[in-house]
């Protein structure tokens, strides 16, 4: 029996530190345990928001070029799908003011469509579950596509002697 009550956390901190780490399965679980004990602010955070706009599926076969993105954390008016010649760009931007501060989420995904895609038949659809689908039917054998993702949008520079780009906003 102790002279004064000691809580479980203080008792663990007074024990041998290596034995305490072994109890939590080395450093992997210790990190989770420490974040729960020492950083209560992060405990209440919605960690599903960390991978916003990262889940995507791309299909490029001899029938179609298709992209499917999970954008469930964005409202329809916060999304923009744009086609510049054969360059497909999907952008999402959200700004939210909370009681603890200001949150800004943004993503940009770009793909170069294959040469045999019918650009006039490109179709976009956003369902009720937050899945954005973009399809472009192909006429013949497909070529490899190029993809890139950026965390912020790039500014366009004006270069002389370049023909104007055929820009179409497919979804906004």
UniProtKB/Swiss-Prot annotation:
SUPFAM superfamilies documented for this protein: HSP20-like chaperones
Give the family from UniProt.
Belongs to the small heat shock protein (HSP20) family.
Keyword annotations for this protein, in alphabetical order, are: Stress response
UniProt record, GO biological process: IRE1-mediated unfolded protein response; protein refolding; response to heat
Q: What is this protein called in UniProt?
A: Heat shock protein homolog
Pfam families reported for this sequence: HSP20 (PF00011)
InterPro entries, alphabetized? A-crystallin/Hsp20_dom (IPR002068), Alpha-crystallin/sHSP_animal (IPR001436), HSP20-like_chaperone (IPR008978)
Per the record, its GO cellular-component terms are: cytoplasm; nucleus
Protein's UniProt keywords contain Nucleus = no
- Biological source species: Nippostrongylus brasiliensis
User: What is the organism lineage in this UniProt record?
Assistant: Eukaryota, Metazoa, Ecdysozoa, Nematoda, Chromadorea
Q: Which PANTHER family match?
A: HEAT SHOCK PROTEIN HSP-12.2-RELATED, HEAT SHOCK PROTEIN HSP-16.1_HSP-16.11-RELATED
Please verify whether the record's keywords include Cytoplasm.
Answer: no
Which parts of the sequence are annotated with region: Disordered?
135-172
Which residue range or ranges hold the sHSP domain? Answer: 47-153
A GO molecular function assigned to this protein is: unfolded protein binding
